[in-house]
Amino acid sequence: MAMKRAKVVFTCGISLLALCAVAAVFGTTNTIGQQGKVARVDWMSKLPDSTEISQLNIPGTHDTLALYGLADFSGQCQSLDVKQQLRIGVRFLDVRLKQIGNKLRAVHGFVDQKESFDFVVKELESFLKENPKETLFISVKEDDKAESPAFSFEECLNTYLKDEFWYTSDTMPQTLGQVRGKMVLLTRYDDGNKGVNMADKWQDCGSFSLDDFYIQDEYIIDDIEAKKAAILACSEKDSTYRLNFFSGYFRKGFPPSNAPSVAKIINPWAIKALPQMNKRGVCLFDFITSELMDAYFGGQA
């Protein structure tokens, strides 16, 4: 969640901890990745190079690196580290960072995640070296602003973007063959000049169109049934690409930032609902599990 939105909620009297709460493959028909036997660690290797990115179903995680919370109830969104997530099939990573000097560090709002981006990138590069036919989609967001930085956020990010591993065009790749063994960069920070820019038109807490994308990110939840309806509605949209966030927090919950509160309801529901969703797009989950991945891939082993 953006630092701006965190400040707004905080000034409204809701603890910033609430914003650290626990809290789709792209396309219109999206049948690829649902049928047949798929080995999760290299499931993309079974697909032809000609596979259109817009026809893929891609499982992802919201706040991918948020393994730690404040006082054990705020900030954590995942229980599996990035290496474990990749091995069970996750391919869209929602990365939240803070600039410290000329380096980047994983955060969720103001909650430090005890991980440097240097280490994370090495893990991602290592995975792609071992699985060169896979592709990762990396959304990078500046989740906490640095105080009077000597370098811009993107200048720091550029030091991590090796051409060997990164696809940094401002348009989405057309086919899987274009980006095998690479990370496709999507950006959610101000004044970005690399990657697919999502920041300029991103709306806070809603369902909206953004260029070729349709995005459902209704993260403030008063009615869990309304959240389910928003997820299902997103899955039926005819946009070229879809990002469908299954994550969120209860505005009126107590404590308001209780990390597993939404996931405890949404994830079991998703396990039943996902096999019926033909057009999944990119689905981003809190507390991803192998059971969720089984449902996402239609019960494949």
Segments (PLM) and residue ranges:
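N-terminal Sec-pathway targeting helices
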Residues: 1-15
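Hydrophobic membrane-insertion alpha-helices, especially the h-region
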Residues: 12-24
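Long, acidic (Asp/Glu-rich), low-complexity accessory segments flanking structured domains
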Residues: 23-88, 92, 101-130, 135, ...
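Conserved, mostly hydrophobic/aromatic
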Residues: 96, 138, 185, 283
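An acidic- and aromatic-residue-enriched active-site/binding cleft used to recognize and process polar
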Residues: 97-100, 141-143, 190, 288
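Active-site groove signature of glycoside hydrolases
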Residues: 99, 132-147
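Short, electropositive alpha-helical surface patch
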Residues: 148-160
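Surface-exposed substrate-engagement region within the catalytic domains
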Residues: 164-275
